[in-house]
């Protein structure tokens, strides 16, 4: 049953287009996009994510700067480091790898990144732009990746019923705003929702971003369900599984993303797409 969505293949298509676009920009401007990644500490999972971002960036011609800092750094000192990156005209985009140590004020750090370099889309100004509908500057990359996958397999979303399980600022909330703009009827559920399966089993599209390994079994879906599994749960060392019981659900739904190989590669692709956007926006600002 060929209903498994290959997120890696879709991401590679985006990266191939970005590579050509970057080559054209270099020929026109003699400059390249540059991504700064701020990593605090040596969390093994964070290190793997950062390496993947750097590897994919280099493949398409984006330079990277890794700023690796000690877990003992104070919030104000980290803000000072981010301000240095904000003022560096050679830096197109900045990401702060999450999670941060509990001693650091995450909200202050995310707010310190210049909105024009906030390619993660976490700055309050960019969040406000998205939810107000006034404009869309930078949007969280996982939400963009989910929307791209959904539209690939369901191009006309008008009137579709979507359940998002998860209310985070990274996935649930921004994706709900994007889907509302596509004229979907969106229901947001979470870990405290009662009778969850009675809600999800009647809907067209289910996005699982609850952070609970293999929680969603076959009873949560119907044969026409499109299932987007955003969960990344590490078990038994380096093994990664999603929020959906993939082995038992896959044959009982219309389409499903695997973990790994589903939304993860799409998130990185849109992170780099946002980096190129930031670079182009900076060129426009310099020309004014």
Swiss-Prot record:
It catalyses: (6R)-5,10-methylene-5,6,7,8-tetrahydrofolate + NADP(+) = (6R)-5,10-methenyltetrahydrofolate + NADPH; (6R)-5,10-methenyltetrahydrofolate + H2O = (6R)-10-formyltetrahydrofolate + H(+). Its EC number is 1.5.1.5, 3.5.4.9. NADP(+) binds at residues 166-168, 191, 232. InterPro entries: Aminoacid_DH-like_N_sf, NAD(P)-bd_dom_sf, THF_DH/CycHdrlase, THF_DH/CycHdrlase_cat_dom, THF_DH/CycHdrlase_CS, THF_DH/CycHdrlase_NAD-bd_dom. One of its GO terms (molecular function) is methylenetetrahydrofolate dehydrogenase (NADP+) activity. One of its GO terms (cellular component) is cytosol. Keywords: Amino-acid biosynthesis, Histidine biosynthesis, Hydrolase, Methionine biosynthesis, Multifunctional enzyme, NADP, One-carbon metabolism, Oxidoreductase, Purine biosynthesis. Pathway: One-carbon metabolism; tetrahydrofolate interconversion. GO terms for biological process: L-histidine biosynthetic process; methionine biosynthetic process; purine nucleotide biosynthetic process; tetrahydrofolate interconversion. PANTHER family: C-1-TETRAHYDROFOLATE SYNTHASE, CYTOPLASMIC, C-1-TETRAHYDROFOLATE SYNTHASE, CYTOPLASMIC-RELATED. NCBIfam families: PRK14171.1 (NF010768). Catalyzes the oxidation of 5,10-methylenetetrahydrofolate to 5,10-methenyltetrahydrofolate and then the hydrolysis of 5,10-methenyltetrahydrofolate to 10-formyltetrahydrofolate. Belongs to the tetrahydrofolate dehydrogenase/cyclohydrolase family. Homodimer. This is Bifunctional protein FolD. It comes from Rickettsia massiliae (strain Mtu5). The gene is folD.
